[in-house]
């Protein structure tokens, strides 16, 4: 295994080759269809070249291009990971990581090892990022005992040219990049395995915290707090439509906004003030005070980075970041093109650089020269990367600009085509001239020193906007920020030809409109990713995971494509901010990302980077465990909500399923209610009655409630009556089994038996639960038909679920697979019928095998005909 530590990373093309370089001519000569392999790789004899990639799709694409002289195997992601059962980071031994072969990956590793034994040389072509470098390192460590040449190749585009370039410039595994990945893994594991148990103990089981995800949740919570604290301010605007006096054309009318009142900036704060201004303007005469025109330019955006791709996917298509990356991954790894096979359509999609390779720029210029000659600049535009950017890869671009979105419309599905068009268009536009337009500003002055302002623009040259098919003033919309635009195409109208000193006439009365200042908008995926990027939190490759995690953990929820913190998210955020100020500090988290970058650059060693984080975190963790973090499980918050049963004010408590309301008169009154979020804040859940459903035990109405296993029916007289049953019922509604008036009491304590509902249906339980945990099957009221047996048919549970059998088991072993229904068989006279699925529908059948009776289709199993 060949590895190296370099003072700084070099571009992939400039890495020093360590022998075994394969020429482009060799690749071209071997591009023919290979034999079968588990990943689509060739089956050439011993002494060939083995290439190991991450995904089977990528393996098949490489196989198609390279042919049978190369065997390609896929690792299917990471082969090694930290153990799930323990933290796996030894803080006393320089943070040594305990990697082990992941569950289910031993077979994959054995296949790779077997293929490597018969290979002359091995190329590790996992993705060109930190995760890919770690995968290559772990594979190399497992194959090192074979004493074969192992080289690292970086494939930035899955095309014949891109693969040939990678194989002609093999390098070594970059241990600095591996250490950076290890450091990130160590930090995330330390935080997750330290904080999650603490949250389980103080809040509820199943919660988690993360080094970056928790900061993302904090941003959402902080924004919600800003919105709640925001006090709107009223203001008014006045618009007036004018028309040149000497013009007779209706098209010469234009709209202007009141800009100044008596020479001072127009600030109108109430309806009374607005009315006074309208009265002031009513008799005023106006003329054109000034006309100014300036040429403006709208620059094209740089080529796409990972974060901008995710933002644009969210803004334009409402795609979650995860979906955008999944679609881009498919475009990179290869799509089936008729006559060409699997073809990589874009370059590697995880990058924070806006740089383009010279050959890519020339490819774009050639396309622009042929299709948009007026938009071709004299030289290729260059874009500056942000400070601290890792410039290892190009920006995201198409591998062949001549594969236009139109040419692939019949090949790609809708999502693939939309993302490809976004990438293709961004690439071409970035290499074109800016759009030029003439912006005109007109000041309309009144005879009382009041003035209106109007602006308009006229397209001079569409430049890069020509790619969108935009022409004229429609293409000249202002370059608003993405948050302001929200996907709209608003534009400023072109003004008529006006001259200074020309008199104008007001058409109709002015239009006064009331407005209120708005709070900052809630984050959507695009704006939250942009905020994380601007603050230096996380890296492009992690944003999609962050978005998914905070939603899956139920710390935030989406409403109308915006992030709202849940009550759980707000609660956990408050606890973490109070107990772990460094961990939840935005600047501290950004600084740790810079430290990981420094490890990758070779400017800092792994141990120091992890130690810089662990020392302050360990101190905060000790204080939190020692009582610094509030134990919500032991805390009750008073509310002003009365108990619906006894009227006592309820208190807010935390249980294993989250926050809930409990009667303050506990244990005398054991009433509880779930909490739901409303516009006015948390409120008790309103439990609807189930129409027509009555309790079998006491006759009171049944209501719908929620538990661990979903909704169920419970008696409205709870806790006096604890009867429950499943809801909604599975299959056709069956009436509840009437309980006999002489139902025997609990055989253990003498208490009453009540109907309850569990995972496997209804059953009888002692009303004194949990003091008495006696249970019995729910009686069906149907006697066993075996001669001489006085048992009753009752539900029982086996390996395959619920079945019905005699209550005298094991003396009587008679069983039935379906629920018995107290209706005699009209064919043979058997005492009851049985429910059975026939053709996917629930039907009534005779349980006697020799009878074969089936009730007519559509007949309700629970109702006699």
Model-derived regions, located:
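Conserved nucleotide-binding/hydrolysis micro-motifs of P-loop NTPases
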Residues: 56-59, 76-81, 128-132, 156-161, ...
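Intrinsically disordered, low-complexity regulatory segments
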Residues: 2-185, 194, 275, 384, ...
């Amino acid at each position: 295994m060949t590895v190296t530590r370099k003072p700084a990373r070099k571009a992939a093309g400039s890495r020093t080759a360590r022998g075994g370089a394969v020429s482009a001519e060799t690749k071209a000569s071997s591009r023919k269809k290979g034999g079968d392999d588990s990943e689509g790789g060739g089956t050439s004899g011993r002494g060939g070249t083995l290439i190991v990639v991450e995904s089977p799709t990528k393996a098949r694409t490489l196989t198609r291009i390279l042919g049978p002289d190369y065997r390609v195997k896929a690792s299917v992601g990471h082969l090694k990971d930290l153990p799930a059962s323990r933290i796996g980071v030894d803080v006393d031994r320089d943070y040594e990581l305990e990697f082990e072969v992941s569950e289910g990956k031993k077979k994959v590793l054995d296949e790779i090892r077997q293929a490597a034994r018969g290979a002359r040389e091995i190329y590790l072509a996992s993705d060109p990022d930190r995760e890919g470098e770690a995968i290559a390192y772990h594979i190399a460590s497992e194959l090192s005992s074979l004493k074969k040449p192992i080289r690292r190749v970086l494939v930035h585009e899955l095309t014949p040219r891109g693969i040939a370039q990678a194989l002609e410039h093999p390098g070594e595994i970059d241990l600095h990049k591996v250490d950076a990945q290890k450091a990130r893994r160590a930090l995330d594991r330390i935080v997750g395995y330290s904080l999650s148990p603490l949250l389980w103990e103080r809040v509820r089981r199943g919660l988690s915290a993360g080094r970056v995800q928790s900061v993302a949740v904090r941003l959402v919570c902080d924004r919600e707090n800003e919105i709640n604290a925001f006090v709107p301010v009223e203001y008014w605007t006045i618009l007036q439509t004018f028309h040149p006096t000497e013009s007779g054309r209706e098209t010469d009318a234009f709209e202007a906004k009141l800009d100044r009142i008596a020479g001072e900036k127009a600030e109108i704060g109430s309806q009374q003030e607005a009315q006074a201004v309208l009265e002031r303007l009513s008799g005023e005469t106006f003329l054109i005070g000034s006309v100014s025109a300036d040429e403006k330019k709208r620059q094209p955006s740089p080529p796409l980075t990972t974060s901008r791709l995710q933002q644009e996917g969210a803004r334009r298509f409402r795609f979650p970041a995860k979906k955008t990356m999944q679609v881009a991954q498919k475009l990179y790894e290869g799509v089936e093109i008729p006559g060409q096979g699997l073809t990589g359509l874009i370059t590697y999609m995880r990058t924070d650089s806006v740089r383009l390779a010279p050959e890519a720029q020339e490819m774009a210029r050639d396309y622009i020269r042929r299709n948009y000659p007026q938009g071709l600049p004299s030289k290729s535009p260059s874009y500056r990367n942000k400070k601290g950017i890792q410039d290892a890869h190009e920006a995201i671009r198409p591998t062949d600009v001549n594969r236009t979105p139109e040419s692939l419309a019949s090949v790609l599905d809708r999502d693939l085509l939309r993302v490809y068009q976004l990438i293709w268009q961004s690439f071409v536009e970035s290499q074109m001239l800016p759009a030029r337009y003439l912006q005109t500003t007109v000041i309309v002055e009144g005879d009382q020193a009041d003035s209106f302002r109007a602006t308009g623009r006229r397209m001079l040259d569409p430049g890069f906007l020509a790619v969108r098919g935009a022409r004229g003033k429609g293409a000249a919309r202002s370059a608003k920020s993405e948050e302001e635009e929200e996907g709209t195409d608003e534009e400023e109208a072109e003004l008529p030809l006006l001259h200074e000193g020309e008199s104008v006439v007001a058409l109709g009365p002015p239009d006064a409109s009331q407005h209120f200042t708005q709070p900052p908008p809630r984050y959507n995926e695009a704006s939250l990713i942009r905020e994380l990027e601007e603050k230096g939190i996380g890296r492009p490759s992690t944003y999609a995971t962050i978005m998914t995690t905070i939603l899956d953990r139920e710390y935030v929820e989406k409403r109308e494509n915006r992030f709202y913190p849940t009550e759980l998210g707000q609660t956990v955020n408050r606890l973490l901010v109070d107990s772990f100020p460094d961990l939840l500090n935005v600047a501290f988290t950004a600084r740790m990302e810079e430290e990981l970058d420094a490890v990758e650059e070779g400017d800092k060693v792994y141990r120091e980077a992890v130690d810089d984080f662990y020392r302050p975190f360990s101190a905060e963790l000790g204080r939190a465990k020692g009582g610094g973090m509030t134990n919500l499980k032991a805390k009750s918050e008073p509310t002003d909500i009365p108990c619906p049963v006894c009227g006592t004010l309820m208190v807010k408590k935390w249980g294993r399923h989250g926050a809930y309301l409990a009667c303050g008169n506990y244990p005398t009154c054991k009433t509880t209610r779930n909490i739901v979020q409303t516009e006015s804040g948390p409120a008790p859940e309103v439990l609807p009655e189930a129409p027509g459903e009555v309790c079998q035990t006491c006759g009171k109405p049944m209501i719908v409630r929620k538990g661990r296993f979903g909704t169920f029916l419970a008696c409205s007289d709870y806790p006096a009556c604890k009867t429950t049953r499943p809801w909604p019922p599975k299959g056709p509604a069956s009436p509840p089994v009437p309980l006999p008036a002489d139902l025997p009491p609990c055989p253990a304590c003498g208490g009453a038996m009540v109907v309850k509902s569990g995972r496997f249906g209804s059953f009888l339980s002692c009303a004194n639960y949990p003091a008495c945990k006696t249970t019995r099957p729910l009686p069906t009221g149907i006697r066993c038909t075996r001669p001489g047996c006085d048992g009753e048919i009752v539900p029982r549970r086996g390996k395959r679920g619920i079945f019905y059998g005699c209550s005298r088991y094991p003396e009587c072993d008679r069983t039935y697979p379906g629920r018995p229904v107290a209706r005699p068989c009209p064919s043979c006279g058997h005492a009851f019928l049985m429910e059975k699925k026939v053709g996917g529908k629930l039907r009534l059948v005779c349980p006697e095998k020799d009878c074969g009776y089936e009730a007519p289709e559509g007949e309700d199993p629970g109702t006699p005909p």
